[in-house]
């Protein structure tokens, strides 16, 4: 059993080659293969409009449902979680060493009411800020209320129907 969370983690880049390099470095981690983490990883190429014209944004997106997301516990973080989180470290390293801009967004919703977590980071440059703005409109938490009552009627219709049933039973 254990506590489970739904999550979306996004790493966005200005160029396809940058996304490819990060993905390649990530998949070299033995934990990525051991836990088959690429199964939860999606790739997005989205054309977005800017003041300068059109730009492509390339994103690596983890989508996890009902995940045992333990970053810190008495026994330490889960290895799959550590591996997924290591992609942000790769982005930071590639930015520091090679100037590759990135933006990062982490969204998690836990089982309990109000257990919502958001984290963001970027390369803190013009392109990083652009990517952050892009992510802001592309990944967000939206809460809804769902109901599954059947045969809902207005109060007047319901009262009329109840009255008719009472008259039949008399």
Feature-to-residue mapping (PLM):
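Short, extreme N-terminal segment that most often corresponds to the first beta-strand
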Residues: 1-27
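Charged interaction segments
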Residues: 26-27, 36-170
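Intrinsically disordered, low-complexity, mixed-charge
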Residues: 30-31
């Amino acid at each position: 059993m254990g506590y489970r969370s739904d999550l979306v983690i996004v790493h966005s880049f200005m160029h396809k080659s940058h996304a490819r390099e990060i993905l390649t470095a990530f998949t070299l981690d033995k934990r990525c293969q051991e836990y088959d983490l690429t199964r939860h990883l999606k790739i997005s190429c989205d054309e977005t409009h800017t003041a300068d014209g059109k730009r492509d944004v390339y994103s690596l997106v983890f989508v996890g449902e009902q995940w045992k997301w333990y970053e810190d516990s008495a026994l330490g973080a889960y290895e799959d979680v550590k591996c997924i989180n290591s992609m942000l470290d790769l982005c930071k390293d590639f930015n520091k060493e090679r100037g590759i801009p990135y933006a990062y967004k982490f969204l998690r919703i836990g089982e309990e009411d109000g257990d919502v977590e958001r984290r963001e980071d970027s390369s803190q440059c013009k392109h990083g800020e652009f990517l952050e703005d892009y992510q802001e409109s592309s990944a967000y938490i939206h809460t809804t209320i769902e109901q599954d009552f059947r045969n809902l009627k207005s109060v007047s219709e319901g009262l009329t129907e109840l009255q008719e049933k009472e008259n039949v039973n008399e």
